[in-house]
Amino acid sequence: MIDVSDPENPVFAGCYSEDGYSHDIECVIYRGPDSRYTGREICWGYNENSLTLVDITDRSNPVQLSRTVYEGVAYTHQGWLSSDQRWALLDDEADETRSADK
């Protein structure tokens, strides 16, 4: 994570690398249905073989909230949150290469 509050002098602010490679990440100020995280900065990481949620409110100490894998995972590529932050719509880039019966 890079702090660009002063664009002419970007500063390293922290890193989260506990779940391997991440293809795409969406970070939001959380306003979804779980009130425990309201107002916190939460990132949804689409991490090759999982969906991982990380609280980065304290950039120097990011905390993994969950890691989810799913049947038939091939390459968790990207995703989007619904406007109410109730649903994450996930795109697996390579699951089409597997037949439904395998």
What are these regions (language model features)?
Residues 1-102:
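Feature marking well-ordered beta-strand scaffolds used for ligand recognition
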